[in-house]
Amino acid sequence: MANIKSNLKRNKQNRARHTVVHSQTSAVKTQIKKTQASKSQKDLSLAYKKIDSALAKGIIKQNKADRLKSRLALNVAR
């Protein structure tokens, strides 16, 4: 455990940031699974929205977002 004030603060910030990032990542994964199960256009657009939101917030990178969208589109088309 940190003894220095700035390290205590940094740990607190890191825990808070981890919670936010983890929940958003989880929301993206959940929406992707729903879309793969239902294979509907409505769910596909919701998944795109979640992926784009995570991309804008820096949760995932551009290449991963493109890859996820591509794979989802292929899955729904089949």
Swiss-Prot record:
Gene Ontology CC annotations of this record: ribonucleoprotein complex; ribosome
Keywords on record: Ribonucleoprotein, Ribosomal protein, RNA-binding, rRNA-binding
Gene Ontology terms: biological process: translation
InterPro entries: Ribosomal_bS20, Ribosomal_bS20_sf
Listed Basic residues bias regions: 7-20
A GO MF label: structural constituent of ribosome
Disordered: annotated span: 1-34
Gene3D superfamilies: Ribosomal protein S20 (1.20.58.110)
Comp. bias intervals (Polar residues): 21-34
Pfam families (alphabetical): Ribosomal_S20p
Function per UniProt: Binds directly to 16S ribosomal RNA.
Family the entry assigns: Belongs to the bacterial ribosomal protein bS20 family.
Name this protein carries in UniProt: Small ribosomal subunit protein bS20
Source organism of this protein record: Malacoplasma penetrans (strain HF-2) (Mycoplasma penetrans)
Lineage: Bacteria, Bacillati, Mycoplasmatota, Mycoplasmoidales, Mycoplasmoidaceae
